[in-house]
Amino acid sequence: MTVIRLTRIGRKKKPFYRVVVTDSRKRRDGGWIESIGYYNPLSEPKDVRIDKERLNYWKGVGAKMSERVEKLSQKA
């Protein structure tokens, strides 16, 4: 199953996340199919960028979004 979720990058105590499309069996930071955005929780205001066109495409072909990505996509 294909899922849209966050992958953590950045360094210790300085998280930065990519919004990626990946197979549900992969590890959190394992290989991904496509990166469609990012989320920076440390900036003020929190910086969220998601490519809506690609998000809608992947939802259309059956990808499920994680709860956090659903909340972030409403803010973007």
Swiss-Prot record:
PROSITE patterns: RIBOSOMAL_S16. The keyword Ribonucleoprotein applies. Keywords: Ribonucleoprotein, Ribosomal protein. GO terms for cellular component: cytoplasm; small ribosomal subunit. GO terms for molecular function: structural constituent of ribosome. Pfam families: Ribosomal_S16. NCBIfam families: S16. This is Small ribosomal subunit protein bS16. It comes from Helicobacter pylori (strain J99 / ATCC 700824) (Campylobacter pylori J99). The gene is rpsP.
